[in-house]
Structures are given as C-alpha cells and as structure tokens.
C-alpha cells in the first residue's frame, strides 16, 4: 500500500476479522473527520443502495448519541461502472462501523490536493507552442493541422475556468462545481491558464476543441481529495452522455500525497476510454509519492525549460511518461488578457492539448494516445532526473 499504514491511535484497529482497512495518511494534510469509503469491485447496485440506507441509520444513531460533529453525513457519491464509493463527514464510531461491512474495500482519510503551478512575472516571451511543433528549440512558429482538435472535448479538472474569455471563442462551458462554494468562476486563475494552453485560439494547441470547466479546487488552489474524485466521476458521466469517453480528454494539473481512492478513480476514467494528462508535481522529488501522478494508467507529465532541460522544480522518477514545456508559459488570465505561470501544471495541459489534437487528426483514443505521444516526441530532455525512464519531449510531428 506504499505510504499507507494502519491507524493505531484514536480510530483503533477494527476487531472484526474481515474488516476493511482504515488507512492512515501520515505525511498528508487531512480534512478533519472527512473520509472516503471505497466499496469492493463486486459490489452490486443493490448492495450499494443497502449500504447507504444502513449508513444513514447508523450515522444518525451515532450522531444523536454524541452530537460532536456539525454538518456531518455523506457529501459525494461515486458510481463508476466498476468502482463505487462515497465520501462524507463521520465520527469515529461510524467509521469503525463502516469498516466492518464486508462490502467495503477500504476507508481513507480525506486529504488536501493543490495546484502544481505558481504565478511569475508577466509579459515574458511565449515559447511552448513553437517548441512542440519544431525539432529544435528556438523556433518562432507553431505549425499544426487545421483539424486542430475539432470534435474532441477537454475536461479541465481544476480551479474553474473563465469560460467567457475571448480566447475560448464560445467553445468553453461551465460543467460542475464540486467545491460547493457557490462561486462558479475561476478565482485563482490557474484553471483559466491551463485551459488556454489546451484549447485557446491564441494560446492553445487544440484550437477547435471544446472545453468543459470542472471546479474541484477553491480560489486558494486547494481542495479535498473527495471533491477531486467527484469531479472525475462527473466528467466521465458527462463525456459518456455527450459524444463518448473515447472523444474526451481530462487534464489534472493538481496533486497531493499518495491516495488509493484518487488513483483508483483516475484509473476508472482511463478504463472507460478517456485520456488523462496529469502533472508530475513541483517538489523536485520522486513523483511516485504523489497522486494522481503515481497512477500507472494516466499520462504523467514532467516540466521542461526553454533550453530543453528538466525544469528545476519538476518531479522525476519511474512515474514520468513525458516532458512538456512548463517554465514561463504565457496563457489566458480570468477577465481577459494573459499572464505567465510556471509548473508541471503548465506542462500537463500541453500534453492534454496535443492529445486532443492527435485524437481528432488520427482517430486514436485512451491509452493509445500516450503511446503515440511517446512515438512522436523527441529525445531532447537533459537531466531527466534519477530513475526517470524517458527523456522524451512532446512534439506534434511537424503537423
């Protein structure tokens, strides 16, 4: 289970012989009294409904006796085709009762996930677009096929998006707000920036793709894992009902401590046909300790600088699939105009945008997209980092 260990303090070990694991997140920032519960893979819809009815009764009984937690109860319900679960605010006794249900796989404390980008100076030269369509650094033009991602939908699972920004030309819509803050806008600027790189007319790679904003992080750039999982679930269902998951891309320029729940949700999205681009993280350390970057089925992206070196902040290691421009990237700013940001958060949308572009151009989908990106890329990155299996920088093959 990697960094996980059994809780041995206040929650105690569940005495039932077949009790589910109650995982601990010793190196993560946890949300007080908030948990994610994952059911076993063979849980039927009837089993899940029965468990929810039982949970409501049990939770009500426990809270009535103690009344120690405010606003408690289920918050999100997850229902992928092969993964069921939920999250909520529960007291310790309820968590121990949940773990005793033989249909529960594990219980995981909810943790804080954050963006992988930071604002730097404004008005620096833009270079990322030119770099991904030319074999050498220093070019000044972006060469691309006129199909430009048409027919593909990109899901920005982020801080929200200014869908009215002129660079989106009306191709961006608001989808879902899992933060539940009543603020359907991008108060951070992070999500608008990453989205501009993916689909913007001026700043973007897939200039004809559509974009759906899925807000899972607040205006401070952080949010609970439970909301991220809910955002993934919502995106998969929306894609399934609107053109199909095989014509959908998801970008996740975010991450936090290793989470089985988050990795399983990301894997479910890939299994159902979506392509997922994930930021490796900005801690100059092994990305294997971060989620969702450590999930093997996603395309995990490290950041490169303008001279084709690995960005000094970029994570590295066996989880890395590709590198993409991430230092000093110019893209859209909420309210209009542009700004510069750096981070693996800026690298991942280059991959997501190029994925949408290739899906429209070549008709590929899902896991085949990451493989195709590796084929088209150039072996350009210097100092890819310890244990990193690739030095490939993405390229569109010169259109």
Swiss-Prot record:
Chain intervals with Polar residues compositional bias: 282-294
Gene3D superfamilies with a match to the protein in the record: Peptidase S8 propeptide/proteinase inhibitor I9, Peptidase S8/S53 domain
Primary enzyme class: hydrolase
GO biological process: proteolysis
Signal sequence range: 1-19
Ranges for domain Inhibitor I9: 34-115
Propeptide residue range(s): 20-116
Region described as Disordered: 175-198, 282-312
Protein name: Subtilisin-like protease 1
Gene (UniProt): SUB1
